[in-house]
Amino acid sequence: MKRTTIFALLIAMVFINTSCRENKEEPINNSVIPQGTVVDYMPKSSKRGVSFSFTNVMDLPLLSPYITWDYNWGNTPTNDAALWFDTNGMDFCPMCWNGNYSADRIRSFVAAHPNTKYLLAFNEPNLTDQANMTPAQAAALWPPIVALAKELNLKLISPAMNYGTLAGYSNPIKWLDEFFAQPGVSIDDVHAISIHCYMSSPSAVQDYVRMFRKYNKPVWLTEFCAWDPVPGNVEVQKDYMCSVLNFLESEALVERYAWFIPRSSASLDKAPYMQLLTHTNPPTLTPLGEMFCYLSPMDTTVWLDAKRTILASEYVKLKNTSMALRPSNDSVALASAGVPGLMITNFAAGQQLTYQLYTATQTKQLNLRYNGYSNSICELHVDGKLQNYIDMPRNGSSTEWVTASIPLELTPGCHTVMLALFSGSCSLSALELTK
């Protein structure tokens, strides 16, 4: 697996200073965008994580290249997982699930792993089968947790809230409001608000997340998947994942999120179809797991070096978060890109995809890899300006890919390239700049 490659500092500074700034003497389509970092491949998301125990060490290399954090509802991870996290750019978040946590175990873990950053508080206190606490009961247990976080220099995350079953406190906002109003408790105690959500409607998830803006804190969505109502098949879960991850990555309010759950005891063909890992030995990613790993981090601080083929899923911005993606079946594009990725299966009129690309030399042409059952026309915008239209005649297939080409002279440097489908619909696999 190729990992994200950042240019050496000196080279990066040269590229940024000479290629990613406006140059008044260059042609009209020269880069006029802010400074940034040129990379070979998209970095992994700083937000993406899982709620999982990682008891099988073979699961670690499957997910760790694509996630930055994990928690398992406990005070510590397994020893194998802790070692792997330390050497693979991940952090583990200890949790005080209820009042029966071990402060000494947390202290020992942080001492052995000084890069630990966060401490999670009570798990779903307004559910009777979870932490099961009224705001007053939780407040009585709160000061030692605040003190522990300060002692260990950890940022404290609020109790994880969901719609609950505790009498009088089904509404998570009501529980939190009363909790933060308790003697000895302050909103300033916490760095972020933790929430859980199992609504199957992506728009409902968005509304739920934004409901917690009132606290003026970052939001951590620490458990989620489509479960209520139960999805009818795995394709529904896949569509949900696309919409929700695109939202979570693009929403500034959201600082972190964790999928529930990479593997359960149920078979893969059982609802709610949310498993990322197979039950085989050795395990592999499920198609849903591939999507979770390969969906774009939408990182606008980096510019992809277009010396390779750019996969359609490597966008940094899109107009509609309901864009549907699936593991790519375009072997030619995948081989040319040198990285696993996804294809867009519902690129429809009105949709927009934005890419941040760097080219070291003057380009001559843009190629799009696509297929579909209708004739399509795509607008090409470069650095904020409409440049041309790309004809994409139907090829009558969902598995065979064809190429549409158009002249495109880009000066060396960083450029935003936006594809906006004007009419028709198609699947999109990749784009390529040629010299």
Q: Language-model segments: which ranges?
A:
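Extracytoplasmic
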Residues: 299-435
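Bacterial Sec-dependent N-terminal signal peptides
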Residues: 16-42
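Aromatic- and acid-rich polysaccharide-binding/catalytic face
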Residues: 94, 123, 173-211, 215-229, ...
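Active-site groove signature of glycoside hydrolases
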Residues: 113-135, 156-167, 188-197, 221, ...
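Aromatic-rich peripheral "rim/lid" segments of glycoside hydrolase catalytic domains that contact
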Residues: 91-93, 253, 260-313
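N-terminal carbohydrate-binding/catalytic regions of secreted carbohydrate-active enzymes
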Residues: 45-119
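Active-site clefts of carbohydrate-active enzymes
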Residues: 158, 164-167, 214-241, 259-278
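Bacterial N-terminal signal peptides
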Residues: 8-15
